[in-house]
């Protein structure tokens, strides 16, 4: 047995570290940091000299952590380490693009990729605007105190320049669409800029977020078809807003104590112990609106099966969520990616199940008409 300066005891090849070198859960501090069990502040600590002991990970957080150090604060400002927000912004776009596809056909893959790129950029821009508005509040909330602007990793001027770069790239994506869609996309910028202020003036900032995050339900259809069909797009947009009210109210319960102390408002603080009743109402409204979308767009059995699965998933979320446990709220919040993907899959399969237009009938009709006139 060899003693190493009080730092640990070596028995064979095993190192036993003393308590002051141990992190959360009793893990050695270095291991705790690499496995993600340390606090949020450890994320900003310099990495140890070698990375050889770390397991290879392709998670979004691992990719951000492996980026050049000067870039990391900007990637975190865009929330690239937490891609769930990008998914929740992108999925309503996929629903709309899928519904706009011709019967018997897959969605337009070019549009899906274009909107995916736009979702990454606009979610990043939205987070940048949010953190610029909220930097003083973020410092007072435990969960947000280490965001790059609040922590001082990025200055106000740097964040403004970075915002301009993101919006410029997003404009480049938007210019690939038709004029109608360009105008619609530009109109959404007002919602993007004003949403972060809503938590200061109303208990319904989640409604403002829903109006913002589900704009793609309108834009996706118009990008494919050239304009919006109100019979399909409006109930689809409404269903997305109801969905956002569900998942973002659950999300807001993570910060309700801090929000109440610093004077910020949310539906979590408004609904309190009646949260599950409100969320149940939003869930019923969402499923009802999706059923109307199906009827208006001539959807088939796979679509309605997916709507039923969405309803079941939401019911499970609402019934089982513990609004007083931040960890459970986060878990339920992130599970909403599955909700969106289920619906998209149902739209695609429902559309493939439709009969393709019989082009030969049109050709035969033209031939018969020409014979009668000759």
Curated annotation (Swiss-Prot):
Its main location: mitochondrion. Its EC number is 2.5.1.39. Residues 105-108, 175-176, 222-230, 299-300, 354-374 are mitochondrial intermembrane. Pathway: Cofactor biosynthesis; ubiquinone biosynthesis. Residues 64-83, 130-153, 198-200, 252-277, 322-332 are mitochondrial matrix. GO terms for cellular component: mitochondrial inner membrane. Its cofactor is Mg(2+). It comes from the Eukaryota. PROSITE patterns: UBIA. The chain crosses the membrane at residues 84-104, 109-129, 154-174, 177-197, 201-221, 231-251, 278-298, 301-321, 333-353. Residues 1-63 form a transit peptide. Gene3D superfamilies: UbiA prenyltransferase. InterPro entries: HB_polyprenyltransferase-like, Prenyltransferase, UbiA_prenyltransferase, UbiA_prenylTrfase_CS, UbiA_sf. It is a multi-pass membrane protein. One of its GO terms (biological process) is isoprenoid biosynthetic process. It is found in: Mitochondrion inner membrane. One of its GO terms (molecular function) is prenyltransferase activity. Belongs to the UbiA prenyltransferase family. This is 4-hydroxybenzoate polyprenyltransferase, mitochondrial.
